[in-house]
Amino acid sequence: MDDDQQFCLRWNNHQSTLISVFDTLLENETLVDCTLAAEGKFLKAHKVVLSACSPYFATLLQEQYDKHPIFILKDVKYQELRAMMDYMYRGEVNISQDQLAALLKAAESLQIKGLSDNRTGGGVAPKPESSGHHRGGKLSGAYTLEQTKRARLATGGAMDTSGDVSGSREGSSSPSRRRRKVRRRSMENDAHDNSNSSVLQAAASNQSILQQTGAGLAVSALVTTQLSSGPAAGTSSQASSTQQQQPLTSTNVTKKTESAKLTSSTAAPASGASASAAVQQAHLHQQQAQTTSDAINTENVQAQSQGGAQGVQGDDEDIDEGSAVGGPNSATGPNPASASASAVHAGVVVKQLASVVDKSSSNHKHKIKDNSVSSVGSEMVIEPKAEYDDDAHDENVEDLTLDEEDMTMEELDQTAGTSQGGEGSSQTYATWQHDRSQDELGLMAQDAQQRDPQDLSITRIAGLTWNEWNARLAMPLVTLREGVQPLVFPTDLSVDKQQGAAGLTAKDVNVSGRKTPTDGGGCKSEPRAASTPARTHSSSNHSSNGNGSGKPTKTSSGGKLNHLTEEEATALMLKAVAEKQAAAAAGTELSFGEDQASSGNGNSSDYPATLSGAVTFADVGGPAGLCHINILNSISAMNNLISGSTAAGVGITTGSGQSPSNSGHNNSAGGGSSVLGGADNGAGHPCPVCGRVYKLKSSLRNHQKWECGKEPQFQCPFCVYRAKQKMHIGRHMERMHKEKFKLEDVKNFAGSSGLDGDSSGATATAASVVAAAAALVSGVELHPHFS
């Protein structure tokens, strides 16, 4: 008997102790696992306490599998919520008489035990919403567990009633105005979570998925699906209240966003009726989860096909006023642009999203499929990859917002033509990106290879042809290590392209309109471009200077001037260097001046262009054998780089004893400018100062405003290079002030370069390029100029 005796251990203050422990945990915010929000303020709580004190919260929390859900109570004030929390945790609360009615009403809507009668019902239920940063919160969870919830609801009771009401609010979510102003990708993710997540999951195993790849149509479907939740939720609460006596369905969606209210009030009657019928059918067959899913899809499809035809009046902040389109067929037609426009007018999309919709729908790079909306009962499914297509669109939009100063002519040169890609796809600059140590000469050869396809698409940029731009940009400062003798490059070389070794007819006479600062007596070698025609390559043809004065020309040509290509200009440089090396090796004293220019050693047919003030070879001192070749003394000097192989329309014949340079000088001795007959054929607009011809008058005005007669305004911080364009300085620094050049590139360029021309002078020049390149490979070192 004694062994069977049992003792009863009683905790006298058990309940009060437990309640006090919960109160302490709440005050310390320990082990809290949910948050209640009202009027923008938050209160943390414990799920177990809320479930024990309210069957409404018990049902709500059973549907939530998030670790810490957030519930937003629309119709409850924060003071009332705080009082109800004190009541649930402590069992009592002190409140004034004027707040008693509101507190009891809120407590009855939340079914708090002791403050409400759960048997009679008829209260007002606020609409809790889950925050978007918890993966859709309650709404997505209710959609995902739809079949489980329906099976549980079949048992009936108070839990069934509140759960069914919660189900009736599933499609009524509308993102807040703040959330609708974020980027479109976030908008699409929220729309998937709040409006269409379980519909996609339930229908994937039963119905075929509609494929659509148009970005504009995808946004239209998202917008309209979210829009349809407004009238659908309103009719859902009405249908539920007419069939069952439920305590929580009178004002389900009392405080929605203003745009959703307007949409719900102005939607078509047919749309409302069809949505109401669909929801009624869903509540009559609550045990069948698939039927409910189909009904929700039905209201989505019908609201999309009819709701877009109605104009929304008011709330200009959410309606894109710039899109004044909204016909009866705007949403149902196969055109995705009209569908997206009607979705914009539905009042859900803000102006930022509307502009993205319009841009995406008009993008011709995406294929658009018709028949995106099927008949009643089918699924409205958005292809997930439509979201990733927007990344390219966003990048294009961002690229268009570049500052105009950053959009240099070099970038326009690479992106203008249809046959040319961007800088990454261009053959010229792809090589440059992969090997930054390339020689400038190799780059010029690659540029020349692309000039022909460029001429087929775009002939001029800012009034300049491709050859003119290449002549401006392609010749940087180069340093050649060679002999001790200073090498002065001829600064005013007239071209006489002869048909043969004894030809006397000049195909082109190119003279400069810029007067060189020399007197009439003699010409001295200066660092600036002011010297006389210097010693040239010796050949069998010696056409001596007619007057023997060697004065530089001062004429201005009114004819059409064609500029040198990079190969021709580089050939001149390499040829002069080779001759300089050969002369230094032979011990010949190189003297450049009037005496040698008039001695008959100069052959004008060897240099294929007039270089008036463009090139200067000067000795800068320092170690012996270091000679600096300043090709781009000024951009304006490069304007006078003129090709003598293409302008066949210029016909000026020179005598056997007079060079074209002196002939041009005699023509302009009286102070007038000689116009070469037949060069322009009456077309174009010549510059009265320098004689350059432009096809457009605006290009001529540009030239006169920024270039003609203007000194270079931009100075390279590392060398003496100056330019009239800021972009030229940038390109110069990028290419020239890098690591050393490689001689292999010079060899490749010398082997592949060939001058375009039909005379023997061009052939001789090409041969000299090969010889000069061979001499360079043997002992010449190219490196940047960092003076």
From Swiss-Prot:
Main localization, broad class: nucleus
Zinc finger map (C2H2-type): 685-707, 714-737
Domain of life: Eukaryota
Region (Disordered) location: 115-200, 228-340, 506-560, 653-677
GO biological process, one term: axon midline choice point recognition
Signal sequence extent: none
Pfam assignment, any one: BTB
GO terms under cellular component: nucleoplasm; nucleus
Cellular localisation: Nucleus
PROSITE patterns: BTB (PS50097), ZINC_FINGER_C2H2_2 (PS50157)
Annotated ranges, domain BTB: 32-97
Tissue: By stage 11, isoform B is expressed throughout the mesoderm, whereas isoform A, isoform D and isoform L are expressed throughout the ectoderm. Expression becomes restricted during later stages; starting from stage 14 to 16, isoform B is expressed in muscle. Isoform A, isoform D, and at low levels isoform B, are expressed in the CNS. Expression is also seen in specific types of cells in the embryo; isoform A and isoform L are expressed in a dynamic pattern in the ventral neurogenic region starting at stage 7. Isoform L is expressed around the tracheal pits at stage 11.
Subunit relationships: Isoform D interacts with JIL-1.
Function of the protein: Putative transcription factor required for axon growth and guidance in the central and peripheral nervous systems. Repels CNS axons away from the midline by promoting the expression of the midline repellent sli and its receptor robo.
Name under which the protein is recorded: Longitudinals lacking protein, isoforms A/B/D/L
Species assigned in the record: Drosophila melanogaster
